[in-house]
Amino acid sequence: MQNTSFDNESDYSDDSDFASASETENRIGLTVPLELAGGRLDAVLAKLLPDYSRSRLTLWIKEGAVIVNDKPSQPKDKMIGGEQIRVTVRPSEENLAFVPEPMALDIVYEDDTVIVVNKPAGLVVHPAAGNWTGTLLNGLLAHCPELSQIPRAGIVHRLDKETSGLMVVAKTLPAQNSLVWQLQERTVKRIYRAVANGIVPFDGKIETQIGRDPHNRLKMAVVKFGGKPAVTHVKVLERYLAHSYIECSLETGRTHQIRVHMREANHPLAGDPVYGNPRHPCGDTVKEAVKSLGARQALHAYRLSFTHPESGETVSFEAPIPDDIYHLLSVLRLEAGLDSSLSNEEEWQDKFGADDDDDWNEDDYDVEVVYVRE
């Protein structure tokens, strides 16, 4: 069964519900300020309790966990100011799954403030329906028990289950606030490497609105209305007979953003089980190499740069391209009559030169390709 939890590349800053990992049922007492008079109860609570999503607060109201002036209430009830509200904070099912589980983690960097981890393909980031155990969050809680006191165990952005690569995790609440702010301000640099179907003809920018697919609620899609702005910069590293090796830089972090954008550009990622094209014409050897990826798409979060929350310095990290994607690249290069002996990122950079991705801007592109849905 397909996982509908959308454990993916989006940022928690987009849909924050920052409950503590160790959340237990407790009560909160509030007084409605006069400046919120005239507002609905659910809207007033959303302003008074910004750490919880409005949908979650609405559910608590309907379940009787919100008492106004000693009486049950409804989400649409109007407030006049001065009401006494008691909220029983109930742990969500996902928070009950926030338990430590020892697992081998590829820690790229760690200090007293942050952890940078290289997530393998196949590992879900966060407990959700269909994946309540064995997630990266569970492993982080075992590795660093104090993360139980940080909302979402310090996780501020996500990668899809079948996407590998770098993630940063906050070890303190101030660090988490800093990283969330950086994500919201789009100052965190995230560079992905991917193999796309077809000959990608451009270096440029894909800019759309992304929302739920109106025809399939288990997928995301480019939509005309009701979506969120999404911007991906694409650079072609190498072209083969029927595929391209590309680098994608995110300005925003929407659900399945790169996968949806490359599908919109008619160049879905190789091996993508949701947005890909399993009938993409290519040689038998390449088909076998794509199959060897298993359930994962050829997408890897290769480079991550952000301002360190404590030192204020810009820090950058890289995670080598995984063996399965390198095998696919070698097969593609061999089929195209190119040198297929490159076995790691250092050899790739020695042969082709290392690009300075930290200085990317729109002027770097030969052609700017913009897909805008208004």
Curated annotation (Swiss-Prot):
SMART domains: S4 (SM00363). GO terms for cellular component: cytoplasm. SUPFAM superfamilies: Alpha-L RNA-binding motif (SSF55174), Pseudouridine synthase (SSF55120). Keywords: Cytoplasm, Isomerase, RNA-binding, rRNA processing. It catalyses: uridine(1911/1915/1917) in 23S rRNA = pseudouridine(1911/1915/1917) in 23S rRNA. GO terms for biological process: enzyme-directed rRNA pseudouridine synthesis. It is found in: Cytoplasm. The active site is at D160. Residues 1-20 are annotated as: Disordered. Pfam families: PseudoU_synth_2, S4. CDD domains: PseudoU_synth_RluA_like, S4. It is an enzyme of class 5 (isomerase). InterPro entries: PsdUridine_synth_cat_dom_sf, PsdUridine_synth_RluA-like_CS, PsdUridine_synth_RluC/D, PsdUridine_synth_RsuA/RluA, RluA_PseudoU_synthase, S4_RNA-bd, S4_RNA-bd_sf. Transmembrane segments: none annotated. NCBIfam families: PRK11180.1, rluA_subfam. Responsible for synthesis of pseudouridine from uracil at positions 1911, 1915 and 1917 in 23S ribosomal RNA. This is Ribosomal large subunit pseudouridine synthase D. The gene is rluD.
